Amino acid sequence: MALLREGHRCIVGIDEVGRGAWAGPVVAGAVAVPPEIYANPLVLSDADDSKRVPARRRQALADEILSVTSTAIGWVDAWLMDALGASEATHLAMRTAVTALASTTRDGAIDGPGWHARRASGVARSAEILLIDGYPIGNPPAPQRAIVRGDRECLAIACASLVAKVARDTFMTALAHPFPDYGFDRNVGYGTRDHFGALIAHGLTPLHRRRFQPMRHLDQCSSAHAPALPSPTRTAPTGRGQLGFLDGWDTL
């Protein structure tokens, strides 16, 4: 890899999941892949853009990524997305993930109003350069290079895409229990015909992004809302791999 030949030793890939969803947080993964992994074609050989990896394979791949890399997850809640807008909220999730990756506390935990980040695996790593899928982010915490289709072309970005996808899907699927009418275990917060029907029938939840359509229109037309979101548990569910800790996210 050219960046390794240039002398960079901590190359961090970043990608987001959930920017275009109707409900739930936007989530960013930040992954520092050790140089020796690039030299071994047998390790992480199936890592790819999370949209191209079958759902049944994502959890196993995410667990493999966590076992050999330093990884952090950052997320921004729906209400803060409404306040900041999708682009700035996504950039904030990415920046906090990189900051948590470098934090020397036990789990790299950092939090603010409506945003949170944790290190999910590995030791603290301070990025020398950031590789980002698509477009540059504002106020990056390290020098950055944006790569078009980076989640398909760059191992570190593909890894970030996968862990962010698994983390967010795990979280949204767990919310199908307190909010059974919205099909979060199937749509993970994205827009579908059934999801729209649930919004018409039951109103908006605190997870829904009121600045986004069609929620903005529905919010203006009706004052009916679903009950408040229950306090999240701090117990990781069984059978969800190493990303089960994300069930403890504070979502409001």
Model-derived features: positions:
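RNase H-like, Mg2+-dependent phosphodiesterase core
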Residues: M1-L252
